[in-house]
From Swiss-Prot:
One of its GO terms (cellular component) is cytosol. Its main location: cytoplasm. It comes from the Bacteria. The gene is mnmG. Its cofactor is FAD. This is tRNA uridine 5-carboxymethylaminomethyl modification enzyme MnmG. PROSITE patterns: GIDA_1, GIDA_2. Pfam families: GIDA, GIDA_C_1st, SAM_GIDA_C. Homodimer. Heterotetramer of two MnmE and two MnmG subunits. Keywords: Cytoplasm, FAD, Flavoprotein, NAD, tRNA processing. HAMAP family: MnmG_GidA. Disulfide bonds: none annotated.
């Protein structure tokens, strides 16, 4: 029997990484919010790799933190190993990654949600989204309970129509043994929402005592730990090692001999899998010339003996999995605790969303995370905080937040989804960002804290601390540009010792710092007036000065980008009536309805000639309206 069980400003459906950020953002902005989880023990769960960050993903986590989100703090609180990746490649692509304690991460996030004012947490399965006159009005649970709301955020992860596949064994299921959300897909279809079917997979979890670490390479964390959250200057933790090993020719033989039983190749799996996280059977087929593949053995936490076998996700039958894992170096006697599996799930075509993550056709309905066709905890959380902020702004009748491609990786991620769409699980990568020298992980606070403060997610105390840091950076850069180092025996001895050319006339410290062989830390020896600064400030100063020329060039490119972004296209435009546009452009522009000429230019199938036609039409339309 149906009954009204509660009235809220905002309902969030799902309490994974997207749902947690969305719910917290809404509640912290003063909106009465309720978040539903199929199982309260799944809040903040990591059903795959127990890690946060990585290439491109670390940038997202720091941006979430700069806006006032929780993921960075949760990762810092539960990290068991921290490393910065890509150190050899330069600061634009430095990426922070933390191995986290999976159980403690979930507990941390659940506790944060439970203690958050304005936020209720409820176990239950949402089966229906209620809509009247093109506006969302609430949700219905399988029990018949109705929760009225002014806005709803969908953050269902991989639960929608979830189907678990292990070889020939197939059953309905969600991640980590949870039951799936069986009914919501039909509700979304009835609302005219176009659905897609994707697939992802996860490797086996194995018992620590069954592994021979003496045959593997130990991988330690960084000696000096960089935290994810800008609220933490340092992080002191006892780190746990990870291990690197390899598959063998025997591994590949076992896989090849059992491809006739691999669901990926028998047609049992219909969903499209992630290109950048292929299963081991996919890797063996696609890269047949490779004699071995890397395998990382990673602990699941401090209080468990479970180890995660990264690089070997699979949907092969369990009997094949046992042979396959035991053929890996150091895993000869491995004891599998949880078998690898693939999961198929329903998601939406993200082209149905505005850049605010609100559905174009249903006001007040927002969507975030894997339901939007992405893969990864960080991508989900990034969408979650934006969907949460915008659901709150929608309810308050205020302007919604859209970050563009020059402001944040979050902007790149969302723009890619709503402009280009995706036909496979989308993951962020540094190569997707045109302005990556500006969008570094170290300066995420400088880029986004002002926005977080203006919205209301950054406290006054944190904002003042941020302004103090910003001033320290500006003052030190100015000091280095004004301080002239005169030539002397001591100075030239120092320069020669560091493989640098001696000087014969006075040189500014900033110019010396631009020399690739000289670091900010090394220059302390000939810089007696140097102030004592926090590590994060020193890092920022060094990057800003060393890459000043490149940064200026990229800022000029951003100016050109902004010009096209600022040429807005009215919502009422009928593209079919614009002569000169190609048929494909008319179809794509009508479907996506870009907000600006800049966005239109990024749509696949819209040519530079089509953009010229659009620009001329806009000018004529302007003149005609005057």
């Amino acid at each position: 029997m149906e009954f009204v069980a509660g009235e809220y400003d905002i309902v969030v459906v799902g309490a994974g990484h997207a749902g947690c950020e969305a719910a917290l953002a809404c509640a912290r902005l003063g909106l009465k919010t309720i978040v539903f989880a199929i199982n309260l023990d799944s809040i903040g769960n990591m059903p795959c790799n127990p890690s946060i960050g990585g290439t491109g993903k670390g940038h997202l986590v720091r941006e979430i933190d700069a806006l006032g989100g929780e993921m960075g703090k949760a990762a810092d609180a539960t990290a068991i190993q921290v490393r910065i990746l890509n150190r050899a490649k330069g600061p634009a692509v430095y990426s922070l990654r933390a191995q986290c304690d999976r159980a403690r991460y979930k507990l941390y996030m659940k506790r944060v949600l439970e203690s958050q004012p304005n936020l209720d947490i409820r176990q239950g399965e949402v089966c229906d989204i209620l809509v009247e006159d093109g506006k969302v009005t609430g949700v219905k649970l399988t029990t018949g309970a109705i929760f009225r709301a002014k806005a709803v955020v969908l953050a269902t992860g991989t639960f929608l129509g979830g189907r678990i596949i292990i070889g020939e064994t197939v059953y309905d299921g969600g991640p980590d043994g949870m039951h799936p959300a069986k009914y919501l897909t039909e509700s979304l279809k009835k609302l005219g929402i176009e659905m897609m079917r994707f697939k992802t997979g996860t490797p086996a979890r194995v018992h620590r005592r069954s592994l021979d670490f003496s045959k593997m390479q130990i991988q330690l964390g960084d000696e000096v730990i960089t935290p994810f959250s800008f609220e933490h200057e340092t992080l002191e933790i006892e780190q746990v090692p990870c291990y690197l090993t390899y598959t063998t020719e025997e591994t590949h033989r076992i896989i090849r001999e059992n491809l006739h039983r691999a669901p990926l190749f028998t047609g049992l799996i219909q969903g499209v899998g992630p290109r950048y996280c292929p299963s081991i059977e996919d890797k063996v087929v696609r890269f047949a010339d490779k004699p071995r593949h890397q395998v990382f053995i990673e602990p699941m936490g401090r209080d468990t003996e479970e180890m995660y076998v990264q690089g070997m996700s699979s949907s092969l039958p369990e009997d094949v999995q046992i042979k396959m894992y035991r053929s890996v170096i150091g895993l000869e006697n491995v004891q599998i605790m949880r078998p690898a599996y693939a999961i198929e799930y329903d998601c939406i075509n993200p082209l149905q969303l505005e850049a605010t993550l609100q559905f174009k056709k249903i006001k007040g309905l927002f969507s975030a995370g894997q339901i939007n066709g992405t893969s990864g905890y960080e991508e989900a959380a990034a969408q979650g905080i934006i969907a949460g902020i915008n659901a709150a702004m929608y309810v308050k009748g205020k302007e919604m937040l859209v970050l563009d491609r020059s402001q944040a990786y979050i902007g790149v991620l969302i723009d890619d989804l709503v402009t280009k769409g995706t036909n496979e699980p989308y993951r962020i990568m540094t190569s997707r960002a045109e302005y990556r020298l500006i969008l570094r992980q170290d300066n995420a606070d400088l880029r986004l804290t002002e926005i977080g403060y203006r919205i209301g997610l950054i406290s006054q105390e944190r904002y003042e601390k941020f302004l103090k840091k910003k001033k320290m950076i500006e003052d030190e850069i100015e000091r280095l540009k004004k301080t002239v180092i005169a030539p002397s025996d001591k100075v030239n001895k120092f320069l020669i010792e560091h493989g640098s050319s001696p000087i014969s006339t006075g040189v500014k410290l900033s110019e010396l710092l631009k020399r690739p062989e000289l670091s900010y830390e090394a220059l302390r020896e000939i810089d007696p007036q140097r102030p004592d600064l926090p590590r994060s400030v020193k890092e920022e100063v060094e990057i800003e000065i060393k890459y000043e020329g490149y940064i200026k060039k990229q800022l000029q490119q951003i100016e050109q980008f902004k010009k096209l972004e600022n040429k807005k296209i009215p919502e009422w435009v009928d593209y079919n009536q614009i002569s000169g546009l190609s048929t494909e452009a008319k179809q794509k522009l009508s479907q996506i309805r870009p907000a600006s000429i800049g966005q239109a230019s990024r749509i696949s199938g819209v040519s530079p000639a089509d953009i010229s036609v659009l620009l001329i039409w806009l000018e004529q339309a302007k003149k005609g309206s005057k």
